[in-house]
Amino acid sequence: MSPKSVPDIGDVLARQAEDIDTRYHPSAALRRQLNKVFPTHWSFLLGEIALYSFIVLLLTGVYLTLFFDPSMTDVTYNGVYQPLRGVEMSRAYQSTLDISFEVRGGLFVRQIHHWAALMFTAAIMVHLARIFFTGAFRRPRETNWVIGSLLLILAMFEGYFGYSMPDDLLSGIGLRAALSSITLGIPVIGTWLHWALFGGDFPGTILIPRLYALHILLIPGVILALIGLHLALVWFQKHTQFPGPGRTEYNVVGVRVMPVFAFKSGAFFAAIVGVLGLMGGFLQINPIWNLGPYKPSQVSAGSQPDFYMMWTEGLARIWPAWEFYFWHHTIPAPVWVAVIMALVFVLLITYPFLEKRFTGDYAHHNLLQRPRDVPVRTSIGAMAITFYMVLTLAAMNDIIALKFHISLNATTWIGRIGMVILPLLVYFITYRWCIGLQRSDRAVLEHGIETGIIKRLPHGAYIELHQPLGPVDDHGHPIPLEYQGTAVPKRMNKLGSAGSPSSGSFLFADPVSEDAALREATHVAEQRALTALREHQDSIASSPNGERGKH
């Protein structure tokens, strides 16, 4: 009896795929989706950093959830960390110590989780800044801007709740200084709201279990839903792109999803995981065993939150002790910190609609803008970054005063003055800088690139020769070119005058034949790009509405 032949796995999968396609016909739609094109600019990877960091957060968070006990019940520590043996603490702090010292890989996963949270929030901030300065939030992508703003706000509070759960001295001070004091200061409902959150006076016995539920269930679920909606909108509305040869408001130039984009994304995800793994293994963060358990009677100097909440801490430190009285109710200074936070969040979410309202720009935009081309928006963004940086530095005014031997009162007043003066000064400087860059671009398009060659005229005058970027007239003068919204070359080496580096590895050059083939391929690609640019310019010139709208 002959043995049965083992079926080939490829044939089995092919037959199953054929059966599925004959029933549900997904092949046409799947082929169309896999043929989607994505642009390849490096700045588009910032959003992927946030996405992959969130995936790492989910995986490490699930692992930590298996061992963390969010109870605030008092226990006596008898673990392996000798300096804290016999010390009374909460179960939350005890379980965090056990994760750090007794669970296999616990400290490694804890630190990866914390670093991933910082990278997630930082990536969202930088990603939003890129979208803001390039105008990617304009119609029809206002909804994605709102989603990104909500993701940043949720990430800030998710991180705040996360590092508050271990119940160490630093996290307890943060809860007392921010959540408890601000809540108590709210008029009319402050006391009732504080009792609802803490179950009585601070610190109570129910806050950490509630933060735990928010941190591992509610907020991550909302973030996951918003990320899914964000990706769906990007997929449906197509990705924005920078202006360039062959790129218009109605197409996308880049690489297809399969195989190039998928393989690049997979490699980038592996790189993010590797970097976070190295950070978690070599860079210590939040060593709670050095801080000890939280005691309401103890307060440590030099206490600051993570960077994304430091601006709120700085605002609380430098805000004057102003109290207002309405209907026999006192509104203390900490409440105004919460009011300003809410105002900042509202301005962040509604900015696309405010810009559209004041500029009257209701057109659809798929091409991005260079920051210099929109000086008002760029100046507003620089002003906001300056405001954030001043408040962040104000959050460490005690450390600055200690290290530089400055009066703490002086650092407070420096922060107050800087919060008002520096953003306005940066706005003016940025605006003038953008105007200067615009004039520099127009000068090159009109006269050409400076060559550094000085020529003496017959009557004795000296001039510098310029290399025209386009055709010249009968007298040899360059014909001014129209600005296309892309980078303008300012040096001769940008035109290839300095030659190109030799191809090959670090030690050995490529063979002559291979080097010649690579040069020929580069030349063909440049000619193809120039041809596409000429066709695009001709189509604009022949179109009655071809002139680009100005913002």
UniProtKB/Swiss-Prot annotation:
Its EC number is 7.1.1.8. Heme 1 binds at residues 113, 215. Binds 2 heme groups non-covalently per subunit. Residues 532-551 are annotated as: Disordered. Gene3D superfamilies: Cytochrome Bc1 Complex, Chain C. Cytochrome b subunit of the cytochrome bc1 complex, an essential component of the respiratory electron transport chain required for ATP synthesis. The bc1 complex catalyzes the oxidation of ubiquinol and the reduction of cytochrome c in the respiratory chain. The bc1 complex operates through a Q-cycle mechanism that couples electron transfer to generation of the proton gradient that drives ATP synthesis. The cytochrome b subunit contains two ubiquinol reactive sites: the oxidation (QP) site and the reduction (QN) site. This is Cytochrome bc1 complex cytochrome b subunit. The lineage of its organism: Bacteria, Bacillati, Actinomycetota, Actinomycetes, Mycobacteriales.
